[in-house]
A protein has these predicted regions:
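Phosphate-backbone binding interfaces of nucleic-acid-interacting proteins
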Residues: 1-166
Length: 166
């Protein structure tokens, strides 16, 4: 029988990790044969990292685009990303699809490439929930807590958030 950690947390108030729950269940005589992570998000969030928006200015050739400078925490110079989200602002921690990342729009796969938007270079994409498959909102980008480490893989952030929310 397979039991979801999220389902179990719905019935048991605990701060234990899945590994710790496995040990606890086994010690109670309920043998856990294996822990398995199931990929329910297409692409598994590969290529997505936490970025820190250092600057955000209005695009001179658009009434809704913004030009941002984003630190990806990789030791390289910050990158310029053009973003159309109404809620993007300097100082935010965000999820960034880096160059080469594969994202999905329904059944269509597309790759994040270096591009120009209204004459300004963009080297990635700051993501909303629906763009990475973790929700349906397209009202704006995902803004993470201020203490989220820059450069952390987005998969770790999303998994941590899901586990915290139960």
């Amino acid at each position: 029988m397979n039991i979801s950690y999220k389902w179990l947390k719905h019935y048991i108030d605990t701060d234990l990790t899945p590994d710790e729950v496995s040990v606890a269940l086994t010690s109670l005589g309920l043998e856990v044969g294996a822990l398995e992570r199931v990929e329910t998000i297409r692409g598994g969030l590969r290529g997505l990292v936490v970025g820190h928006v250092l600057t955000c200015i209005d695009h001179p050739n658009s009434d809704h685009l913004h030009i941002t400078t984003v630190d990806l925490g990789d030791g390289q110079a910050p990158v310029q990303i053009v973003c159309g989200a109404p809620n993007v602002a300097a100082g935010q921690k965000v999820i960034v699809a880096t160059l080469g990342t594969k994202l999905y729009d329904g059944d269509k796969e597309f790759t994040i490439k270096r591009s120009k938007m209204r004459g300004e270079e963009s080297l990635g994409m700051i993501c909303a929930e629906d763009e990475i498959g973790v929700g349906t909102s397209h009202d704006g980008i995902i803004v993470l807590p201020g203490d989220t480490p820059v450069g952390m893989p987005a998969a770790r952030v999303i998994i941590r958030t899901i586990m915290e929310e139960g």
